[in-house]
């Protein structure tokens, strides 16, 4: 058998030492060298602690996390912040307000307290049954006003166009005064119509223009923070009211002209 070389001897010696230290021999040898075999102080080798180090580190981190959690729970400021965050999440989960409520809050109205809508502000939500009843009353008023107008105008136009001998005061039978009489009658009829319409709106608490006109709803969207904007909205609503009256007058005049043309050929 050939002799071992120096490199092989060193390798074998190194393996033996590692095996000896791995079985706890490192601690015994350290105690013998330092003379602390019977000492109360720990002389355990770092090689022997290598296996237990990860477990000890994990336990240390768990203890620190538990201490931090208990400190957080005992802190009143942290508890208050948690409560506020929970309230924000609950409020965020609620249904968003409808469009009319948002517009009411933008223009200073109060739909919850039942503040009646004013001209230039978005109308508060109205019960659909009440709105249907209001529309029924308004449509009936329009129908009756048209019927009464033509019950008066049709005979008068026939008498004027056919020279029927009637003695009426103030020159009512004179054809030259026809349009003056017509305009006076329209003014009286329109005044009665709007007077009756106001009484209906007062009884149902529904604004006919704000709920029935798309143009009025668009005008109410204009913000009124500045005086110029308020003045603009007021003028637009005034023009819209005048246009309602003028449109009724134009409609009646058109029908009068058609009927006059028919009567002149009869």
Swiss-Prot record:
Keywords: Endoplasmic reticulum, ER-Golgi transport, Golgi apparatus, Membrane, Transmembrane, Transmembrane helix, Transport. GO terms for cellular component: endoplasmic reticulum membrane; GET complex; Golgi membrane. It comes from the Eukaryota. Residues 1-54, 86-123 are annotated as: Disordered. GO terms for biological process: protein insertion into ER membrane; retrograde vesicle-mediated transport, Golgi to endoplasmic reticulum. InterPro entries: GET2, Get2/sif1. The keyword Cell wall biogenesis/degradation does not apply. Residues 11-20 have a biased composition (Basic residues). Belongs to the GET2 family. This is Golgi to ER traffic protein 2. It comes from Zygosaccharomyces rouxii (strain ATCC 2623 / CBS 732 / NBRC 1130 / NCYC 568 / NRRL Y-229).
């Amino acid at each position: 058998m050939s002799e071992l070389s120096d490199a092989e001897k060193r390798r074998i010696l190194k393996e033996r030492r590692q095996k000896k230290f791995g079985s706890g021999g490192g601690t015994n040898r350290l105690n013998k060298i330092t003379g602390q075999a019977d000492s109360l102080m720990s002389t355990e080798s770092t090689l022997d602690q290598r296996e237990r180090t990860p477990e000890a580190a994990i336990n240390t981190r768990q203890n620190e996390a538990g201490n931090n959690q208990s400190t957080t729970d005992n802190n009143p400021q942290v508890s208050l912040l948690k409560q506020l965050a929970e309230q924000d999440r609950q409020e965020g989960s609620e249904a968003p307000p409808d469009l009319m409520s948002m517009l009411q809050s933008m223009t200073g109205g109060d739909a919850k307290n039942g503040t009646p809508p004013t001209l230039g502000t978005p109308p508060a939500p109205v019960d659909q049954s009440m709105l249907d009843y209001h529309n029924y009353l308004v449509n009936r008023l329009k129908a009756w006003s048209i019927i009464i107008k033509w019950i008066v105008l049709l005979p008068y136009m026939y008498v004027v166009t056919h020279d029927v001998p009637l003695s009426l005061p103030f020159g009512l039978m004179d054809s030259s005064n026809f349009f003056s009489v017509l305009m006076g009658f329209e003014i009286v009829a329109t005044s009665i119509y709007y007077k009756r319409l106001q009484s209906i709106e007062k009884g149902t608490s529904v604004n006919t223009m704000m709920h029935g006109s798309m143009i009025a709803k668009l005008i109410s969207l204009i913000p009124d923070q500045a005086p110029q904007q308020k003045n603009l909205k007021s003028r637009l609503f005034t023009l819209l009211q005048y246009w309602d009256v003028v449109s009724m007058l134009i409609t009646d005049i058109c029908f009068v002209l058609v009927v006059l043309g028919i009567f002149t050929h009869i």
